[in-house]
């Protein structure tokens, strides 16, 4: 991969978000005004493709303690967490403590299309071979 800055990668990822790359569970809440909504899983996987590191996951809770869902982001080395989608959450949603998640050998069917859509857009914008690991 040609040398890229994290700032450049972040800009490209954010510009590539769309309803097509949104988690199906969040599609009804996705909008250009909240483009990060439902992008955390796809974004974390694409950043992991590009930069390696750990995948982090945490439950997201409503004020009554019930679970809204899960949130995913990245850690690169000790103390450097990158969460491009944290702003997606409403004030009533709280991200809990994270744990490291092993990357699945294959992306699950539920979000595979969304991940591939984001990966294709990001790799094209960065002029990378979409078939590279």
Outline where the language-model segments fall.
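A structural boundary/capping signal
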Residues: 1-133
């Amino acid at each position: 991969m040609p040398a890229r800055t994290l700032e450049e990668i972040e800009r490209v990822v954010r510009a590539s978000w769309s309803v097509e790359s949104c988690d199906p569970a969040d599609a009804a809440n996705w909008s250009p005004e909240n483009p990060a909504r439902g992008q955390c899983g796809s974004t974390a996987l694409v950043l992991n493709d590009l930069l390696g590191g750990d995948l982090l996951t945490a439950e997201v809770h409503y004020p009554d303690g019930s679970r809204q869902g899960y949130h995913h982001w990245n850690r690169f080395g000790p103390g450097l967490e990158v969460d491009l989608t944290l702003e997606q959450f409403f004030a009533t949603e709280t991200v809990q403590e994270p744990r490291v998640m092993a990357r699945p050998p294959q992306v699950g069917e539920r979000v595979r299309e969304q991940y591939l859509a984001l990966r294709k857009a990001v790799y094209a914008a960065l002029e990378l071979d979409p078939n590279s690991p």
